[in-house]
Amino acid sequence: MNKLEEHYIVPKDVVAELDKYIIGQDEAKKLVSIALVNRYIRSRLPKEIKDEVMPKNIIMIGSTGIGKTEIARRLSKLIKAPFIKVEATKYTEVGYVGRDVESMVRDLMSIAVNMVKEEMYSTVRDDALVRTEERIVDSLFKGSSNSENMDPNEIKAEEKVKEKLRKKLRAGELDDTTIEIQISSKMPFSTIEIFTGGNFEEIDMGIGGLLGNIFDRKKKRELKIKKAKEIILAEELEKLVDHENISDIAKSKVENMGIIFIDEIDKIAAKNRSGNDVSREGVQRDILPIIEGSKVNTKYGIVDTSHILFIAAGAFNLAKPSDLIPELQGRFPIKVELKSLSIDDLKKILKQTKNSLIKQYVAMFKVYDLDLKFSEEAIDRIAELTFNMNLESENLGARRLHGVMEIVLADLFFEVPGSKLKKFEINLDYVNKKIQINEQKDLNYYII
């Protein structure tokens, strides 16, 4: 992880990180890692060449639940890049009621702004906590308000009392104490909603900045210290961060590191030129300029999409990538087909990934002080059952594991809370018993 954080990245390092969370799909992981590293290489090029190097956008082909979204999401987390997943079917052609395609860029920019804010908050959090503590202690302490007229002994005595209050505050002993504090009460005038081009859009009119001083009034409130700490800390964090740079840093992150994942791209692939297919083609033509590179107005400024990485995905059961308009196909030079999950893949997903499904359930039962274990035979049976159901009905990939696990563990979730049970093993017989009980029902109906 250190290499990734320091940006000394090579494709093998990226794949090694993805392997911790995603089973199989080696070809897809390899191609997205190359695309990521090439973006890093671009950032090191001279400006005249850098501007000419375009991102190698990717189309992932495969059914649901096999890792398409997770690969892109984990990739963005590794490099702390702004990431958004959108569904192609949610957008409409310009002139129709619905979301316009530029909103995906506006949403990505909002995500980036929040990311930058959180990064800035982390650097000033310690100072903000000290300030928060002092404000609460001052509210609690009823001593003199003018230290200039106090003699040294009085000042020392006051500081001793304050230090005792600080210790109690840090220990949580004062959480239920009620205090009166002054908090900011700003009027929410930063954005307004207007109706334009068949869409509701949020437009920043800058009113918050113009009238901020008028409507930023202080008001007194009585709150328990636990709640007051949250409010005061948020205020102090806002005071300490450099708001002028947030939008600029976020814009740079979006333009150079942003990732937009367009799911269900196959649903807007037009196989003929009539009826709904014409509308779908219209959405494709609206998406095209954004992928090619265009300037999009957001409430944080104009964003250039030329170097955003676009990853599209779809099952392509009823359509083929070649059914997309040729211009859009050309903007996705890399196409990779993800494989359906085997029984062995499902076993590994259950127990080998960093935050595997079994680890999650074991942790949940640990809250009830129950040590839950799964035998290897039980894991094999759960994987086999999931695989067979994916063959017999719609292939949901790893997502079906959740449904199977819930059926197997339903009685435990009901019985364990409040019981004295400390240890329990899920074995093959237990899994078969739970499955047989439910076989009288249509498992394909109940397990999704």
From Swiss-Prot:
Q: Name one Pfam family in it.
A: AAA_5
Indicate the principal place this protein occupies in or around the cell: cytoplasm
Q: Which organism is it from?
A: Borreliella burgdorferi (strain ATCC 35210 / DSM 4680 / CIP 102532 / B31) (Borrelia burgdorferi)
| InterPro entries per record | AAA+_ATPase, ATP-dep_Clp_protease_ClpX, ATPase_AAA_core, ATPase_dyneun-rel_AAA, Clp_ATPase_C, HslU, P-loop_NTPase
Please give the Gene Ontology molecular function terms for this protein: ATP binding; ATP hydrolysis activity; peptidase activity; proteasome-activating activity
So what does this one do? ATPase subunit of a proteasome-like degradation complex; this subunit has chaperone activity. The binding of ATP and its subsequent hydrolysis by HslU are essential for unfolding of protein substrates subsequently hydrolyzed by HslV. HslU recognizes the N-terminal part of its protein substrates and unfolds these before they are guided to HslV for hydrolysis.
Keywords carried by this UniProt record: ATP-binding, Chaperone, Cytoplasm, Nucleotide-binding
Q: Where in the cell is it found?
A: Cytoplasm
The record's note on quaternary structure and interaction partners says:
A double ring-shaped homohexamer of HslV is capped on each side by a ring-shaped HslU homohexamer. The assembly of the HslU/HslV complex is dependent on binding of ATP.
Give the UniProt family note.
Answer: Belongs to the ClpX chaperone family. HslU subfamily.
Give me the segments passing through the membrane. none
Q: What is this protein called?
A: ATP-dependent protease ATPase subunit HslU
Query: Which residues participate in ATP binding?
Result: 23, 65-70, 263, 327, 399
Cysteine-cysteine disulfides: none
Record NCBIfam families? hslU (TIGR00390), PRK05201.1 (NF003544)
Q: Which PANTHER family match?
A: ATP-DEPENDENT CLP PROTEASE ATP-BINDING SUBUNIT CLPX-LIKE, MITOCHONDRIAL-RELATED, ATP-DEPENDENT PROTEASE ATPASE SUBUNIT HSLU
Q: Which HAMAP family match?
A: HslU
GO CC annotation, single: cytosol
Please cite one Gene Ontology biological process associated with this protein: protein unfolding
The record's section on SMART domains has:
AAA, ClpB_D2-small
